[in-house]
């Protein structure tokens, strides 16, 4: 029994129903920062700490990452759509106008990203028209969130071919409401009600 051929457009449309975060995978090669936008990123193992991402086999950025043996995963925030678009483009200098600092291994950490994961390339596996790259995590951190700015600290998401974000749950009371209710309804020894 033969398997029916899968139409590439249908394949993309169906997989587009799965919402993903957006990362920028970066490295430095011959002292030049390199990076690309990547949705195919995932945690792989806690012990040892491993992550994975899947670049296309034609990716020039992957060639630089492979040569350097290191990379940094930058998890983008909701307000970084322009950063994602820039790194998803064919611009020759994707870092023009992008503020960044070097990670412990020397790969770019993009300012404003929600988190970064600094890795060494551990293994590379064939994945059809992509490579499946395992990274050994060497350092990681998340952006410090100021309580009043917490609403701005949401991930940038991609769903059905478009950017999207997380809407606050309008059915759950805000934290201040819970705190106020607890304060107003708390009883103590001197409560006279």
Locate each region found by the language model.
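Basic, polyanion-binding surface patches
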Residues: 1-193
